[in-house]
UniProtKB/Swiss-Prot annotation:
Optimum temperature is 30 degrees Celsius. It is found in: Plastid, Chloroplast. Keywords: Chloroplast, Lyase, Magnesium, Metal-binding, Plastid, Transit peptide. This is Monoterpene synthase 7, chloroplastic. Belongs to the terpene synthase family. Tpsa subfamily. Highly expressed in flowers, petals and sepals, but almost undetectable in vegetative organs. GO terms for cellular component: chloroplast. GO terms for molecular function: gamma-terpinene synthase activity; magnesium ion binding; myrcene synthase activity; pinene synthase activity; sabinene synthase activity; terpene synthase activity. Binds 3 Mg(2+) or Mn(2+) ions per subunit. A motif (DDXXD motif) lies at residues 348-352. Its cofactor is Mg(2+); Mn(2+). Its EC number is 4.2.3.-, 4.2.3.115, 4.2.3.114, 4.2.3.15.
């Protein structure tokens, strides 16, 4: 069989040669032009293999719909920018005025974080918390009778990479009873702060584990007992926190909720509230522009039209990137991650649904070797898949080399090769009807969920990346595995029923049921315990030695938060209408008033 390709001139895939796969400028290289129109001519007709279908819904976010999104207050953007600058200056003055008042400083920092504007004051907050960390024992004594302040101090330090001991809460335990003091049971604010702090538990921290059980029980009692909690902000916060703790929430959506709740609090700061509103809407406009840009790229690429078997979810893929890193200076990562997410979905559907086993073996081999010269062995649709990934990775590698003088391509190649190898292993399991043990499944499932590729992309596209940072990435940092495992298990919880119906490999719950001969409810409870253990490991890795490490750790922590957002109530990724559409509207389209 002979195959010829007719390459359209509109969308260009650059063939990049050179040492280590490093990209050279497009003018100096040969070009592969293969999209959006591809014509395949066969010299002989052979019977097409039987293809499965995922029966996915088409995207509700068409290119025209995305391009029609309007920016809020566009005529006043310059004025809003000046107002934000003025309000930032006022907030800096406020931080100066509160020096020496530790409790008030802690409350202000907490408000800045929850209002989503702490990134404007990163250095000032870090310096303040560094001082608190140096005086931790003295401040702890100062707050010996104040549960709220003690828990807030503990949480803010841990959230920002300072390793502090759970022993700060021993003073709130009754030595004779061996449990938390009875007087705390009615302190709603203190209980709520301790509840949120308890979700930063590390391995072996029994006191925080006790604190979670204690606060959960008594916060529920306060909500249920008539007259215990009057209507107001604290009641809203308690109900909201019991649904999902702060440490596991999608930050931008939480910010929008908190702005709405805090503005009804009579003690709120009007200037700080205005800063949060203006900043939220300014970032929302930025996100709309970014989404417009990646939508043009996606439309020019033409993959959904040429390969209609996979899930076309550009807007959702961009939203993943916003969850990972929302700040303005992370656009390079958001752009590359959106593209990577699109390709992950495409290739995942090739392995899970569309490809034959023989085709998948060939594709895996070529991805491992990163060998563009071998693509003639592939069927036409796989050539398109390979070239899309190959050229996008190499183009990103060229830009990073040009701007920073470091070669990220080997690290992205490694991540793509590992992903495809794990996809291949699971495809063999499916085609042979094999059900692995839970440990055997999980051993590779944290790779096959694509988290390591996403985090490799985050690492390589970080704005402060240096050669020294890249050298450290020869092996994955310890935070990567628990982050990816949580992504995997959230995904399995939300999608396994639908994926099994399409013909996918057995997931964590089914592997546990098969191995232990237990019903689904028991298996799910066991997987929940595995997830809690991984959260403890993840929390234990929140110690950053540099701004770059802090950025990367934040992305790693946001990975399971994104999974909770998309899969907490089913498959909010594949089934992109309903709740997911509401959240997209809230974050990307509807400004705060």
């Amino acid at each position: 069989m002979s195959v010829s390709l007719s390459f359209a001139a509109s969308a260009t895939f650059g063939f990049r040669g050179g040492l280590g796969g490093f990209s050279r400028p497009a003018a100096a290289i040969k070009q592969w032009r293969c999209l959006p129109r591809i014509q395949c001519h066969s010299a002989e007709q052979s019977q097409s293999p039987l293809r499965r279908s995922g029966n996915y819904q088409p995207s509700i976010w068409t290119h025209d719909r995305i391009q029609s999104l309007t920016l809020s207050h566009t005529a006043d953007e310059d004025d809003h920018g000046e107002r934000i600058k003025l309000l930032k200056c006022q907030t800096n003055k406020l931080m100066e005025e509160k020096k020496g008042e530790v409790g008030e400083q802690l409350q202000l920092i907490d408000h800045l974080q929850q209002l989503g504007v702490a990134y404007h004051f990163k250095d000032e907050i870090k310096d303040t918390l560094r001082g608190f960390y140096a005086s931790f024992e003295d401040i702890s004594l100062q707050f010996k009778d104040n549960l709220h302040a003690s828990a807030l101090l503990f949480r803010l330090l841990r959230e920002n990479g300072f390793s502090v001991s759970e022993d700060i809460f021993k003073k709130f335990k009754d030595d004779q009873k061996g449990q938390f003091e009875d007087r705390l049971q009615s302190q709603a604010e203190g209980l709520l702060s301790l509840y949120e702090a308890s979700y930063l538990e590390k391995d072996g921290e029994e006191l925080l584990h006790e604190a979670r059980e204690f606060t959960t029980k008594h916060l529920k009692n306060l909500l249920e007992e008539e007259g215990s909690l009057k209507p107001g902000l604290i009641r809203e916060q308690v109900a909201y926190a019991l649904e999902l703790p702060l440490n596991r929430r999608f930050q931008r959506l939480h910010t929008k909720w908190f702005i709405g709740a805090w503005q009804r609090d009579p003690t709120m700061d009007p200037a700080l509230l205005l800063l949060a509103k203006l900043d939220f809407n300014a970032l929302q406009n930025m996100y709309k522009r970014e989404l417009n840009e990646v939508s043009r790229w996606w439309t020019d690429l033409g993959l959904p039209q040429k390969l209609p078997f996979f899930r076309d979810r550009l807007t959702e893929n961009y939203l993943w990137a916003v969850v990972f890193a929302f700040e303005p200076d992370s656009w390079a990562f958001r752009e590359m991650d959106t593209k990577t997410n699109c390709f992950i979905t495409m290739i995942d559907d090739v392995y899970d649904v569309y490809g034959t086993l023989d085709e998948l073996e060939l594709f895996t081999d070529i991805m491992e070797r990163w060998d563009v010269n071998a693509i003639d062995k592939l069927p036409e649709y796989m050539k398109i898949c390979f070239l899309a990934v190959f050229n996008t990775v190499n183009d990103a590698g060229y830009e990073v080399m040009r701007d920073k003088g470091v070669n990220i391509i080997p690290y992205l190649k490694r991540a793509w090769a590992e992903l495809c190898k794990m996809y291949m292993r699971e495809a063999r399991w499916y085609h042979t009807g094999y059900t692995p043990t839970l440990d055997e499944y999980l051993d590779g499932a944290w790779i096959s969920i694509s988290g390591a590729l996403i985090l490799s992309t985050a690492y390589c596209m970080g704005k402060d990346l240096t050669k020294e940072d890249l050298d450290k990435f020869s092996t994955y940092p310890s935070i990567v595995q628990p982050s990816c495992m949580l992504l995997r298990l959230h995904d399995d919880f939300g999608t396994s029923t639908e994926e099994l119906a399409r013909g996918d490999v057995q997931k964590a719950v089914q592997c546990c049921m098969h191995e232990r001969k237990v019903p689904e409810a028991v298996a799910r409870e066991h997987i929940k315990q595995v997830m809690e253990a991984k959260w403890r490991v993840l929390n234990g890795n929140r110690v950053a030695a540099s701004s770059f490490e802090e950025y990367f750790q934040n992305v790693a922590i946001n990975l399971p938060r994104a999974a909770q957002f998309f899969y907490g109530k089913g498959d909010g990724y594949a089934n992109a209408d309903g709740e997911t559409q509401k959240q997209v509207m809230s974050l990307l389209i509807e400004p705060v008033q």
